[in-house]
Curated annotation (Swiss-Prot):
<keyword id="KW-0969">Cilium</keyword>
<keyword id="KW-0966">Cell projection</keyword>
<keyword id="KW-0175">Coiled coil</keyword>
<dbReference type="Pfam" id="PF13851">
    <property type="entry name" value="GAS"/>
</dbReference>
<feature type="coiled-coil region">
    <location>
        <begin position="210"/>
        <end position="347"/>
    </location>
</feature>
<comment type="similarity">
    <text>Belongs to the DRC4 family.</text>
</comment>
<keyword id="KW-0206">Cytoskeleton</keyword>
<keyword id="KW-0282">Flagellum</keyword>
<keyword id="KW-0963">Cytoplasm</keyword>
<dbReference type="GO" id="GO:0008017">
    <property type="term" value="F:microtubule binding"/>
</dbReference>
<protein>
    <recommendedName>
        <fullName>Dynein regulatory complex subunit 4</fullName>
    </recommendedName>
</protein>
<feature type="coiled-coil region">
    <location>
        <begin position="28"/>
        <end position="93"/>
    </location>
</feature>
<dbReference type="GO" id="GO:0005874">
    <property type="term" value="C:microtubule"/>
</dbReference>
<feature type="coiled-coil region">
    <location>
        <begin position="117"/>
        <end position="170"/>
    </location>
</feature>
<dbReference type="InterPro" id="IPR039308">
    <property type="entry name" value="GAS8"/>
</dbReference>
<dbReference type="GO" id="GO:0031267">
    <property type="term" value="F:small GTPase binding"/>
</dbReference>
<dbReference type="GO" id="GO:0030317">
    <property type="term" value="P:flagellated sperm motility"/>
</dbReference>
């Protein structure tokens, strides 16, 4: 058999790759598990695609609604701008009309002021003539009062001299009588005191001698009895104790009797001293009356000097009152003109304030609407940005959220620091103003003009204040 020829080499079979995994070497179970995993991933991808499709439709619908609202808002803003222009035109017309009325009122007020000034001058002349007549009558009354006062002063001086002479006579008589009675009483009571003291010394000496003798005799008897009964001391101990107690009781009774006698002597001495004090009281009363009369005399002299000073001051004040009367009448006329001018300026100021409030209110409403629209636009953009970042890069979305929170916290802290600094600046400004007001009050109190402070006060209130002063001048937060 001829030899068989060699067969050519077969080509090498390539591996099958699915999702980057070689499936040629897998078993049936592995392939089934791999197929189930692929199916689950495909289902998940399909769900995500449906979810993103729904989110895209929602965003598109939301964007269309927002654009429609934006168009409506722009149309409303145009209408409001037209209304504001119309209102401004009407306000300008009203302002011109009011200014014309103010000119007419000023002209009428000027004419009325001239008439009032002429009437006031006429009344002033009449009042001046009347005041001259009253002044003459008052001068006559004042001369009569001075004459009556002079007569009363002379009469009072004469009565005072008579009373002084009579009082000096009575005082001398009372002093002589009291001095004589005092000497008699002193001599009488000194004799009684010496006699009573001698009697008491003799009586107390006799009593003490008797007590001393009885005590010595008793001691001697006790010593004799003790020597005789020393051997039988235990048998007679109770009898001796009873005898000693009886002796002590009798001695206590004697001491009590002596103490009562001493108390009677003290009472007699106290009665004598009380009688001396009773006799001294009329003399002291007379001295008190003398001092009282002397003090009344001093008061009279002081009142007399005060009366002369008051007369001089009255003359000076009358002249000053005349000058002040003329100044007051001039100031009243000037005050009337200033009051009329102030009323006109006040009405004009109120009209301007109302106009400014209306304009400011319209501007605030427009700004609030613009701010609300910008905030809504910012919220929309933030939502779209977060959704886009969450879809494309979830990790970056978490970082962005934490970054937003951190930035928000930093901004809040900075805002709080700014508010605290503004509050401190406002407190310093308030303290500066209080110090300046106190300084100006002191200058006014001492008659120094406030223009001579030596520096220019800083009172800038153009900037917006976040803190204001409360009812008691306390710095409070302006919320």
């Amino acid at each position: 058999m001829p030899p068989k020829g060699k067969k050519g080499k077969k080509g090498k079979k390539l591996p099958v790759l699915i999702d980057g995994v070689d499936t040629s070497a897998m078993t049936r179970d592995q392939l089934e598990a791999f197929a189930l995993r692929l199916k689950a991933e495909m289902d998940r991808e399909r769900e995500e695609r449906n979810y993103f499709q729904l989110e895209r439709d929602k965003i598109r619908t939301f964007w269309e609604i927002t654009r429609q609202q934006l168009d409506e808002t722009r149309y409303e803003l145009q209408q409001k701008d037209k209304e504001i222009e119309a209102t401004q035109d009407l306000a300008d017309i009203d302002t011109k009309h009011v200014m014309q009325q103010m000119k007419h009122l000023q002209f009428e007020n000027h004419n009325r002021l001239g008439e009032v000034r002429a009437e006031a001058m006429t009344q002033l002349k009449l009042a001046q003539e009347h005041h001259v007549l009253q002044e003459n009558e008052l001068q006559r009354d004042k001369r009569q009062l001075r004459r009556m006062l002079r007569e009363r002063m002379e009469m009072s001086e004469m009565q005072l001299r008579q009373m002084e002479a009579h009082f000096n006579e009575k005082l001398l008589e009372q002093r002589i009588t009291f001095e004589r009675e005092r000497k008699d009483n002193e001599m009488l009571h000194e004799e009684k005191m010496i006699e009573q003291k001698a009697k008491l010394d003799l009586f107390y000496g006799t009593q003490m001698f008797e007590v001393e003798e009885r005590k010595n005799q008793q001691i001697k008897d006790l010593q004799d009895h003790h020597d005789l009964a020393f051997n039988d001391m235990k048998n007679y101990y109770n009898d001796i104790t009873l005898n000693n107690l009886a002796l002590i009781g009798s001695m206590k009774e004697q001491l009590e009797h002596l103490r009562k006698q001493a108390e009677r002597s003290d009472r007699i001495a106290a009665d004598t001293a009380a009688e001396n004090r009773r006799l001294k009281e009329p003399l002291e009363h007379a001295n008190i009356q003398l001092n009282e009369y002397r003090r009344k005399l001093e008061f009279y002299e002081r009142d007399k000097q005060q009366l002369s000073r008051l007369k001089t001051r009255n003359t000076r004040l009358e002249k000053k009152v005349k000058g002040l009367t003329w100044e007051a009448e001039t100031l009243i006329l000037r005050n009337d003109s200033l009051v009329a001018e102030r009323e006109g300026l006040k009405e004009r100021f109120n009209d301007v304030i109302v106009e400014l409030q209306q304009k400011t209110g319209l501007k605030n409403v427009l700004l609030e609407r613009k701010i609300a629209a910008l905030m809504r636009e910012d919220e929309k953009r933030s939502i779209v940005l977060h959704e886009t970042i969450a879809t494309c890069a979830p990790n970056f979305a978490e970082k962005l959220t934490s970054l937003d929170e951190r930035v928000g916290n930093i901004i809040d802290e900075k805002n709080k620091i700014i508010l605290d600094l503004r509050y401190e600046v406002t407190k310093a400004r308030k303290a500066h103003d209080d110090l300046l007001e106190t300084y100006e009050c002191k200058l006014k109190q001492y008659g120094v003009p406030t223009d001579e402070l030596g520096f220019k006060p800083i009172r800038n209130r153009d900037q917006q204040q976040l803190y204001v002063c409360g009812p008691a001048g306390i710095i409070t937060e302006n919320k």
